[in-house]
Amino acid sequence: MPIMDLLNTRNKNMISLLIISFGRYQEVLETFACVNKYHGNKIELLFLDNNPERELEADLSSIVENNSGILFSYFHTGENLGVAEGRNFLIEKAQGDILITLDDDVEIEDITLLIQKVTDYMANNAKVGALAFNIKNYFTRKALSHEIPHGNKKLDFSQNLLTYYFIGAGHAIREKSLSKSGALP
């Protein structure tokens, strides 16, 4: 089924978290530990294991299995689909109205707060199609200049602002924006 037809069958009240991984075993376990702290309305967590073997399924499932707020789905194709194709693979599987994409090595201080901020902002700003997250260095907690989604790196990124692109490390996008723009390149 084409991606545009799949996007029309989504659950309008669901948030989908999308994570892909290749070669970052320990990091993705730590990311899942952060995600597992989520509490609230049910969310969908979709994971694509780009490694040659199904080495992550049991460990990741065991991290989130007791969290009734997370509906977990694990996928493994046996090949490394790469970033864009891997994310498109998960986009086709996702049921959410808002898709939150996270890198496999992110640390999230409060996943519940992140999801609440995303849903509140999207609810109050109907014209916004995507949100770029403020990605910070793990050790210094300062914004990473190469992860700032704007040409002017001297802006105050502690405040919300409009920008013309978003980064892959962490972002949220409405499914209706994807249905208008098409799959990731």
UniProtKB/Swiss-Prot annotation:
Top-level division of the source organism's lineage: Bacteria
InterPro entries documented for this protein: Glyco_trans_2-like (IPR001173), Nucleotide-diphossugar_trans (IPR029044)
SUPFAM superfamilies referenced in this protein's UniProt entry, alphabetically: Nucleotide-diphospho-sugar transferases (SSF53448)
Name of this protein: Uncharacterized protein HI_0869
Species in which this protein is naturally found: Haemophilus influenzae (strain ATCC 51907 / DSM 11121 / KW20 / Rd)
Lineage: Bacteria, Pseudomonadati, Pseudomonadota, Gammaproteobacteria, Pasteurellales
